C-alpha cells in the first residue's frame, strides 16, 4: 500500500503545520497557495519534505481528485473563506476521501462544510467524509492555552515596557 496523498490548500501557518505533520506520518503531501513568494519560502525551508504548487482552480481540483485527504487552510483576513470545492465536484473525488475544513470558523472553504463539534466531529456527503470542527485547538485546551500564552507574551511585555505607540513602531507584527 502506498502512502496517503494529502493536499493542503493554503500555505500559511496552519497549512504548513498540517503539511509537516502529514509528511512526518509518511504521506505524499502537496501544498497549494496563491502566493509565489510563500511557495518559494516553503520550498527553501522544507525542500523535499512536501511538494508545492500554485493554487489555480484547475490545479486544485486536479490534485484533489487523487487525494485521500484534502485540508482546507485558507484565510483571507476580514473576509469569509472562499469556496474551493463545490458540491458538484465531490463526485470527482476518491470515494471515502476526507475533507478537513480548518477555515470553518470563517464560513468554511468547501461548499458542503458545516460546523461540527468535538463530540460529533464528522459527517458524510456523497461518500466524502467531512471534519469541520470549529475551534480545533479546543480539543487540547490546556496545551493550546499554554502555547497561546507563550506566543503572545513577548508582545504583551513589549506593550507593557514601551507603551503601545513605541511597541507598535518598533515591531512590524504589532504594527500590522
Can you annotate each of these PLM segments?
Residues 104, 108-176:
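Adenosine-phosphate binding glycine-rich loop
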Residues 5, 14, 18, 34, ...:
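General structural feature for long, well-ordered alpha-helical segments within catalytic domains
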Residues 23, 28, 39, 81, ...:
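Alpha-helix termini
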